[in-house]
Amino acid sequence: MTHLERSRHQQYPYHMVLPSPWPMLLSFALLSLTLSLGLTMHGYIGNMNLVYLALLVVTLTSVFWFRDVIAEATYLGDHTIAVRKGINLGFLLFVLSEVLIFAGLFWAYFHSAMSPDIVLGASWPPVGIQAVQPTELPLLNTIILLSSGATITYSHHALICRNRNKALSGLFITIWLIIIFVTCQYIEYTNAAFTISDGVYGSVFYAGTGLHFLHMVMLAVMLIICYWRMRTYQFTSTHHVGFETTILYCHVLDIIWLFLYIVFYWWGV
């Protein structure tokens, strides 16, 4: 039954989702990824092949699922105003869960830093740890990330004002700024004088900044998808929920990075 035929009989503005295999497949893929990663890190599996396979399945499943969602929103017209409100509310709850995760990591950092154990030399950073200096790559990354927040806001306002070229330009610059940030963060990790196994400092540092790093990689993918959708005229000045949620995600990660920089790189050193 086509969308026009369904609209004649549907007396409510909500989208009744058809049966889909992607939620179940993604759940099993994420379970496989978690188990394989844990077993590999603890030495029960001698290589990363299962991790790469599970990651590939997660990626492909996500691509096919997002393809269906984009088709429902763009070509079938299933995303009404009521549906868009529900999507925005759901994404806000997702952002809240992310904030709570980072709040737990900050709690762990303060718990260890404000009362360092005698095993750590009664000092923070612990004795023998050469911390990353806040005036080096972290400061550059902060400037880059704040700049990306400005450019994506510029792109959003240009889209609302129906200036497609400026919107595309701002989004293109944002993508490259995020890629540069991720690259600089990777360089910082490869040149750091400590690892995730160097006590509580290394564990909390890499857990906090590493989780943010993974979110930035995911943000880069989301921005690339938004750029492709904008180029193919799938966004209008009044209907661009995917772009709005990506912008919100970008600003939340900017704020989290500011707290990470102040606490992990500046105050903690």
UniProtKB/Swiss-Prot annotation:
Localization per record: Mitochondrion inner membrane
A Gene Ontology biological process term: mitochondrial electron transport, cytochrome c to oxygen
Disulphides: none
Matches recorded under Pfam families: COX3 (PF00510)
Residue ranges of the TM segments: 21-41, 45-65, 90-110, 138-160, 167-187, 205-225, 247-267
Membrane topology type: Multi-pass membrane protein
Molecular function in Gene Ontology: cytochrome-c oxidase activity; ubiquinone binding
EC id: 7.1.1.9
Major subcellular location class: mitochondrion
GO cellular component, one term: respiratory chain complex IV
Reactions it catalyzes: 4 Fe(II)-[cytochrome c] + O2 + 8 H(+)(in) = 4 Fe(III)-[cytochrome c] + 2 H2O + 4 H(+)(out)
CDD domains per the UniProt record, alphabetical: Cyt_c_Oxidase_III
Protein keywords: Membrane, Mitochondrion, Mitochondrion inner membrane, Translocase, Transmembrane, Transmembrane helix
UniProt similarity note: Belongs to the cytochrome c oxidase subunit 3 family.
Its biological purpose: Component of the cytochrome c oxidase, the last enzyme in the mitochondrial electron transport chain which drives oxidative phosphorylation. The respiratory chain contains 3 multisubunit complexes succinate dehydrogenase (complex II, CII), ubiquinol-cytochrome c oxidoreductase (cytochrome b-c1 complex, complex III, CIII) and cytochrome c oxidase (complex IV, CIV), that cooperate to transfer electrons derived from NADH and succinate to molecular oxygen, creating an electrochemical gradient over the inner membrane that drives transmembrane transport and the ATP synthase.
UniProt-listed PANTHER family: CYTOCHROME C OXIDASE SUBUNIT 3, CYTOCHROME C OXIDASE SUBUNIT III
Subunit structure of this chain's protein: Component of the cytochrome c oxidase (complex IV, CIV), a multisubunit enzyme composed of a catalytic core of 3 subunits and several supernumerary subunits. The complex exists as a monomer or a dimer and forms supercomplexes (SCs) in the inner mitochondrial membrane with ubiquinol-cytochrome c oxidoreductase (cytochrome b-c1 complex, complex III, CIII).
Protein name in UniProt: Cytochrome c oxidase subunit 3
This protein's encoding gene: COX3
